[in-house]
A protein has these predicted regions:
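C-terminal extensions of enzymes
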Residues: 161-197
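Shared catalytic-loop signature of beta/alpha-barrel
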Residues: 37, 43-46, 52-172
Length: 197
């Protein structure tokens, strides 16, 4: 509602940060368009999955009727699903996750498809440290990389199970010189957390 969007705008102005709106596909096209008209004045960075990602026609309708980018793809798993989003111009930012799309090679193929259509890539970083490292490597190797999307600080358990890990500085990830993905699992530490399921 209008009161909430005003409050959100006030927080955004104080924080001096980008405003990324995610709905996890829980809206109708009409409600997403209506919400977008309310929040447009705050210059959102994107509206993520305004409708279910398997309904590319509905998502394209939203994309045509709002004045800031639609982002989608965190739940998509194949280049064919991404191709449908691309062809229908349903999103201008694709959020692939190397752990879901079949790995680095498939991720790079999707990124190339997006690049050929002037779309950006924002790898989805809601994952464990190995997939995060793969997302980072792909991000560093493509020309249409936008941001790494995530809310974790990559401290705590993720760092405990790794011997070598990537480092963050001023909001950016620093690639290291280590081979492969640039990370190394601490197998002794992992053994201290047995799965009994």
């Amino acid at each position: 509602d209008n009161t909430r969007s005003r409050g959100l705008g006030d927080v955004y102005k104080r924080q001096q940060c980008d405003l990324l709106i995610g709905t996890h596909g829980q809206m109708t096209p009409e409600s997403a368009i209506r919400l977008s008209s309310e929040i447009e004045k705050y210059d959102p960075f994107w509206l993520e999955e305004p409708v279910p990602p398997n309904n590319s026609d509905a998502m394209a309708k939203v994309a045509r009727h709002i004045n800031f980018p639609v982002a989608a793809g965190e739940r998509l798993t194949t280049k064919y699903e991404f191709n449908e989003i691309i062809n229908k111009q349903a999103a201008s930012i694709l959020q692939l996750n190397m752990g879901r799309v079949g790995g680095i090679l498939e991720g790079k193929k999707i990124a190339s498809m997006a690049e050929a259509n002037h779309l950006s890539i924002a790898p989805h970083m809601y994952c464990g440290p190995i997939v995060a490292a793969a997302n980072i490597q792909v991000a560093a190797s493509i020309s249409n990389f936008l941001i790494l999307e995530g809310i974790k600080d990559w401290k705590g358990f993720d760092c405990k199970i790794m011997k070598k890990y990537f480092k963050w500085e001023a909001g950016s990830v620093l690639l290291n010189e280590a081979p492969g993905l640039g990370v190394e699992i601490d197998e002794d530490m992992i053994e201290s957390f047995p799965y009994d399921g």
